[in-house]
Amino acid sequence: MYKNIILLGDMGSGYTEQHEVAKLIERIIKKKSKNLICGLGDNIYEDGCKTINDIKFKTNFEDPYKNISDKNKFHMCLGNHDYHSNYKAQIQYGILSSKLGKKWVMPHNYYTYSANNIDFFVIDTNIEHMTDLLIRKQYNKIKQYMNKSKNKWKIMYGHHPLRSIGGHGNARKKLEQMIKGLISYGNVDIYMSGHDHSKQLIKMNINNRDVYQIICGTGGKPGDPYINMNNMRDSELLFFSNIIGVCNIRSIDNNLILDFLNTKIKEFSYTFKK
C-alpha cells in the first residue's frame, strides 16, 4: 500500500524551484513510508537527453531527488521537451534503473501499472512525432490494458492536458480525439497531465459522465501567469494555482483524497467518490 501518490510535472529544470519542490516531497513522504510519484513529463529540460549516459540524468534528476529513497518509484511519461533529442534514452535509462532497483520507471513510452485501488494507464501524448500507424498502435495497446483492468479507480496520464486555462491551452483536435476515446473506452475517472506550469482541477463531461482533469506542471520552473477562461466553455474549473509545488493523492476508505500543495501550505483539497 502506497501512503502517498504524488503528481510531479515539468520538473527537470535543475533550477532552484526543482530543488525546493524536491524538499517538499521529502517532507510529504518522510523516511519510512513507501510512496509513488507520477512523473507527468518534461522530465529533463531543455532538450531531454542524448544517451543513457547523459550528465543531465544526474544533474536534473538524481541530484535533486537524492534524499528520496529508491523504494519510492517515479513512474514517468514523456513530455515535449523530452522529444527534443533522443526520447529513447529515457526509456533505456528507465529499464536499467528498474533492473538496478533505482527510482526512475519507464518500461516504454506508454504502459500500465497498478497501485492501491487504482489502475494507471500512462500514455505518450507527443503524437506530432508519430505516424498514424504508431498512434493507432498505442491506442489499441492501451485499450488492451484497459480490458484487463480490475481496480475500482482508473487513472490515465500523459504530458499534454485535455482542458487547461494555462498558456498552452486545450488539446489540439487529433490529440483530443485520442484522449477522449481512451477515457470513454476505459471508463477513466481522472486524466492527469503537466505541460502548463500551474496546478488545476477541472470537471469535464465526456459522454454524459463526469471526468476530472488534474494538471500539475509546477515541479521545476516558475509558474505560468497566463489564464484563458474561454478554454472552460464546456468544462468547470474547480481550482487554479501557479505556485510551485505538487499534488498528492491518498486512498482512504475506497475514496481518493486529492491535495494541492505549494512549498509552504496546502492550497486546496478535493475528495473523489464513486
Feature map (PLM): residue ranges:
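N-terminal active-site segment of His-dependent metallophosphoesterases
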Residues: 1-56, 164-165
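Composition- and surface-driven signal marking solvent-exposed, interaction-prone regions
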Residues: 20, 135-137, 261-263
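Short, mixed charged/polar active-site loops
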Residues: 2-4, 210, 266-269
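C-terminal/domain-terminus segments
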Residues: 261-274
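Residue-level marker for buried hydrophobic side chains located in beta-strands
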Residues: 5-7, 37-39, 76-77, 156, ...
